[in-house]
Amino acid sequence: SSHDVKMTPQNRTIFFGMDQGSAELNSSNIKGKNPFADKRVRLAMYHALDMDAIQDKVMRGQSVPAGIITAPGVNGHTAERDQRLPYDPELSKKLLAEAGYPDGFELTLDCPNDRYINDEAICVAAIGMFAKIGVTVNLDAKTKSQHFSEVKEGDANGMTSDMYMLGWGVPTFDS
């Protein structure tokens, strides 16, 4: 009998989460308010990411930039919604200025270093991209056991992680 071996892409989406609900970010130099509470700041961070560069240089062509969290092949995925907005660092700077952060701000990114393919390398690349828009991001890369316990645990004031990397995959292909 002959065997037909098929290689298919993983249906995992890697993303950065941002604490939007806390009154103040724990690691930020901005006190008394939370930059991520402003949609313009979150959009600025999004437009700062050159996903084609990450796909090419970090992932060596073995990834597909996603516009939504649901991967192709998963029930609920729609191709027309799975379109990324463009990489646009100038727009990012404009959005930050409009939100009241013309000089950017500083914070920490929590990243696993042993969970996803090239996880820490993706975080390092993103940090360089955020720097180009004036946002200083300090990397806190840890093993997955430390990373996940810190990201999921909050306190009375909200989350303890200001910005973090996570992945979402659906082995059942049903969102």
Regions found by a protein language model. Name each.
Residues 13-14, 65, 78, 115-118, ...:
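Flexible loop/turn segments at secondary-structure boundaries
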Residues 5, 64-65, 103, 137:
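Residue-level detector of short coil/turn "hinge" positions at structural boundaries
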Residues 11-67, 93-95, 105-118:
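Alpha-helical secondary-structure segments
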Residues 1-6, 109, 122, 128-175:
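Periplasmic binding protein-like
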Residues 62, 74, 167-170:
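Glycine-rich beta-alpha junction loops
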Residues 64-98, 113-120:
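Structural transition elements
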Residues 40, 44, 49, 53, ...:
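Extracytoplasmic/secreted proteins, especially bacterial periplasmic and envelope-associated proteins
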Residues 2-8, 17-39, 73-91, 101, ...:
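Short, solvent-exposed loop/beta-turn-alpha elements that line the ligand-binding surface or hinge
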